[in-house]
A protein has these predicted regions:
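Short acidic/polar alpha-helix capping motifs at helix-coil junctions
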Residues: 3-5, 15-18, 35, 60-63, ...
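Core segments of cupin and vicinal oxygen chelate
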Residues: 19-61
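Short beta->alpha connector loops
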Residues: 45-46, 68-69, 89-90, 113-115
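Short beta-strand/turn micro-motifs at beta-sheet edges
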Residues: 3-6, 69-73
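Acetyl-CoA-dependent GNAT
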Residues: 66-71, 135-137
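Vicinal oxygen chelate
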Residues: 2-10, 13-22, 40-42, 52-57, 72-100, 118-123, ...
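Short, charged/polar, Gly/Pro-enriched secondary-structure boundary elements
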Residues: 58-63, 126-130
Length: 141
């Protein structure tokens, strides 16, 4: 039903994935190198927060990483809090997995074994997980 409402309204959504991090510069470097993202925006001391937005031109999503100087928020992701990227081209997937390791991500076993069948799960310094899945997303027409 929800998808019918979006179609009816012709809604074009842009997704921002906002996460607190313990080291803003380190998170920026890891995600830029690992996922080939670029800085698309940044701010300093915005009511006590510093932040950076990472993305790519033409994409319908971006990451926002923040750090509060006055009351740092500790990240508390679970093993099932995932960002999943579908990479159906095998060469692109292998290259991307290697790039994640070079950027400082650690490869871990997925909590849900489904993600290990055709993918690899990586964790960043704050415990956030990214899955690179060597498949097409089955629900996208």
């Amino acid at each position: 039903m929800t998808s019918d409402i979006f179609k009816e309204l012709n809604m074009q959504a842009h997704l921002r994935i906002a996460r607190p991090v313990s080291d803003l510069q380190f998170a920026k470097t890891m995600y830029c190198q690992g996922l080939q993202l670029s800085v698309i925006g940044a701010f300093e001391d915005h009511q006590g927060f510093d932040g950076v937005m990472l993305g790519r031109a033409g994409m319908q999503y971006h990451f926002e990483f923040t750090h509060c100087k006055t009351q740092p928020v500790r990240a508390q992701p679970t093993a099932e809090d995932l960002i999943v990227f579908y990479l159906p081209d095998n060469h692109e997937w292998i290259t991307s997995c290697a790039r994640m390791l070079t950027a400082g991500f650690q490869q871990v076993a997925a909590f849900n074994p489904y993600w290990d069948l055709k993918g690899r799960t990586f964790v960043d310094a704050d415990g956030y997980r990214v899955v690179l899945q060597n498949a097409r997303c089955a629900i996208i027409a």
